[in-house]
């Protein structure tokens, strides 16, 4: 399932409106051809944008959730879907509250648009539970991180953070000392809580 919302300006404030909707064609409640949740979300994203008359290149907000396969510590649906669609959104939301996640995302997207955090928000949700009822639960398709990152020594989010930091250093000339300031400031604020796990301050 997918929605597309886009802001509309009036004389008083920014208002978000739903301008495109799409759903995956089903037969007897099942998809017509075998596919992954990622493929399903990409298809409805394409159709919702077509319904709205908006090119994929204009999407700068992405909100997504769903049953993506075997969960893993590096599972980042918003990043995975963004890369698959070839977009670079400036606002993302991967809040997953189950089958009604897309309903909450409509409210989140409207708030983001009205606050100026994005112009075009794409909302997707995907689950192939009924279509895959014959499969063993443990045999569900793995998310991409399990195939392309975990085998190479990145089983936890820490590796992903390190790659993001390295890229920031490459793009902007950021130094390790500058990034360390984030840890110093975070610890300082956390230590204000007497129940914090780490109370000792750190220094560069």
Language-model segments: which ranges?
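Conserved small/polar residues in nucleotide/adenosyl-binding loops
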Residues: 203-204
